[in-house]
Curated annotation (Swiss-Prot):
Record key words, sorted: ATP-binding, Carbohydrate metabolism, Kinase, Nucleotide-binding, Transferase
EC identifiers of the protein: 2.7.1.170
MF terms in GO: ATP binding; kinase activity; phosphotransferase activity, alcohol group as acceptor
Name of the protein: Anhydro-N-acetylmuramic acid kinase
Pfam families from the UniProt entry: AnmK
UniProt pathway: Amino-sugar metabolism; 1,6-anhydro-N-acetylmuramate degradation; Cell wall biogenesis; peptidoglycan recycling
Protein family membership: Belongs to the anhydro-N-acetylmuramic acid kinase family.
GO biological process, one term: 1,6-anhydro-N-acetyl-beta-muramic acid catabolic process
UniProt entry tagged with the keyword Signal: no
NCBIfam families: PRK09585.1-1, PRK09585.1-3, PRK09585.3-2
Length: 373
């Protein structure tokens, strides 16, 4: 089995930066050693948002974004290597998720698209890359997401304690880790995505730091109820979603019935939407003893407080308490998935995604042996 140092690269639906994690991985352990977050330039963020929200673009524009993101990911990796004084030969492989710009796992031709050309990452780092993790699962009839529950189970599963792991990124997803049962997991709906989109449009701020703006507002109950009637929330698992569904246009359509709504009240309502939609799914699955939260939303004190209030009797805490940085969880997961691919081990869980079988995931982009010698 391949073992040694791996790097995970993750750019999620929140678009709050490229997370890069260095970890030592083998069949018995995943030990995080270093991490950094690399900024996404404004022009790239705008290009990604335009695609995700269905704005027209040419194939040339898509190709340019693909190349530019690949180069950006390479810059982030090289920055981490320089900080740790490591050479390409010290790294077995990079596991790169890419940037999801469209995710449509149902219909006549299910598909998902992550951009950020892995060839450019190899060329500019000299390190083998494993990428394109989701499309094999979709080819096998699965949702292609979420893939992280397998990692949650490997790191945070417990033989007797009923646990759930909640990742609040742009989209929120839940992993059900119940002793003696197959792992399950799915996307519950919007995490930070709508909150971030609203404050960006209203205040030109990338996110609501410490939920300060939302705390100034009051929940608009009729708006909350209207949003919660969206069919996605009542749909059965397996299910997954993304920015192509829960985007600013979705929010605007719901706001048409509330002209003149105070912007702070809308922000408070979006925070409540995230908390309530998650709590409903936790309770629908019978609850748990511990809800372990990771992702950028775990730093939102209002969402965390509301989760605790909506889920009495359940310990709500961040994964940091278990020794795993909530900010780095997903990047770490894709480093681990790269290790599994190189080891010839399956990376998906059919009980989570609905695929017909477990499978080795991803495509391998080998480095030139000269650069890794």
């Amino acid at each position: 089995m391949k073992s040694g140092r791996f790097i995970g690269v993750m750019s999620g639906t929140s678009l709050d930066g490229v997370d890069v994690v260095l970890a030592a991985i083998d069949e018995t352990m995943v030990a995080q050693q270093a991490s950094l977050t690399w900024p996404i330039p404004v022009h790239l963020k705008k290009g990604i948002l335009d695609i995700c929200q269905g704005q027209p673009l040419t194939l040339s524009q898509l190709g340019q974004l693909d190349t530019q993101l690949g180069r950006l990911f390479a810059q982030a990796v090289n920055a981490l290597l320089a900080r740790q004084r490591l050479q390409p030969r010290d790294i077995v492989a990079i596991g790169c998720h890419g940037q999801t710009v469209w995710h449509e796992p149902t219909g006549e031709a299910p598909h998902t698209l992550q951009i950020g050309d892995n060839n450019h990452i190899v060329a500019h780092t000299g390190i083998t890359v494993v990428g394109d993790f989701r499309r094999r699962d979709i080819a096998l009839g699965g949702q292609g997401a979420p893939l992280v529950p397998a990692f949650h189970h490997a790191l945070l599963g417990h033989p007797t304690e009923k646990r759930m792991v909640l990742n609040i990124g742009g989209i929120a997803n839940l992993s059900l880790l119940f002793p003696g049962q197959a792992v399950r997991g799915y996307d519950t709906g919007p995490g930070n995505m709508l909150m971030d989109a609203w404050i960006w449009r209203q205040c030109a701020q990338p996110y609501d730091k410490d939920a300060a703006w939302a705390k100034e507002g009051q929940v608009i109950l009729p708006l909350l109820q209207k949003m919660l009637r969206d069919p996605y929330f009542a749909a059965s698992a397996p299910k997954s979603t993304g920015r192509e569904y829960f985007n600013y246009g979705w929010l605007e359509r719901h706001l048409t019935a509330f002209p003149g709504a105070d912007a702070r009240d809308v922000q408070a309502t979006l925070a409540e939407l995230t908390a309530v939609s998650i709590a409903q799914q936790v309770l629908l699955n019978g609850g748990c003893e511990r809800l372990m939260v990771c992702g950028g939303g775990s730093r939102n004190p209002l969402v965390m407080a509301r989760l605790a209030a909506l889920l009495p009797g359940i310990e709500v805490s961040t994964t940091d308490k278990a020794g795993i940085s909530g900010d780095d969880m997903e990047a770490l997961a894709f480093a681990w998935l790269a290790w599994r691919t190189l080891a010839g081990l399956p990376g998906n869980l059919p009980s989570v995604t609905g695929a017909t079988e477990a499978s080795v995931l991803g495509a391998i982009y080998p480095a030139n042996p000269i650069t890794q010698s």
